[in-house]
From Swiss-Prot:
Gene Ontology molecular function, alphabetical: 5S rRNA binding; structural constituent of ribosome
Family: Belongs to the universal ribosomal protein uL18 family.
UniProt name for this protein: Large ribosomal subunit protein uL18
Binding partners and assembly: Part of the 50S ribosomal subunit; part of the 5S rRNA/L5/L18/L25 subcomplex. Contacts the 5S and 23S rRNAs.
Protein function: This is one of the proteins that bind and probably mediate the attachment of the 5S RNA into the large ribosomal subunit, where it forms part of the central protuberance.
InterPro entries: Ribosomal_uL18_bac-type, Ribosomal_uL18_bac/euk
Length: 120
């Protein structure tokens, strides 16, 4: 593994461990960002199941013309995820940024999820 991959993996582990300490049974909103798309899901770690998910690859997102590589798409994914989570009865989550900086697309997704009904 390259030094950069090792550093990112360690950062991801460190963030996950701190989230596990403060979660208190709340589901985790996990975000994955690639160069072309963004993915988010609400995970119940106690049961090991995904409660809601959304990504920029979905048909609803592709029809709007947004690629996943911009802030507008991240906002749309955050809003869609929050609507699905609230529909399934989840309102409080712990935000897992996955080692990414809280900036740009990650911040836009989090803000849109908050505006649509999730609290973290």
């Amino acid at each position: 593994m390259s030094k950069l991959k090792i550093t990112n993996a360690r950062r991801k582990q460190r963030v996950r461990l701190s989230l596990r300490r403060i979660a208190n049974g709340r589901p985790r909103l996990s975000v994955f960002r690639s160069s072309k798309h963004i993915y988010a899901q609400v995970i119940d770690d106690l049961k090991g199941e995904t409660l809601a998910s959304a990504s920029s690859l979905e048909k609803a997102m592709r029809d709007t013309g947004n690629t996943g590589a911009n802030i507008d798409a991240a906002k749309a994914v955050g809003k869609l995820l929050a609507e699905r989570a609230v529909k399934n009865g989840v309102t409080e989550v712990v935000f897992d940024r996955g080692g990414y900086l809280y900036h740009g697309r990650i911040k836009a997704l989090a803000d849109a999820a908050r505006e649509s009904g999730l609290s973290f």
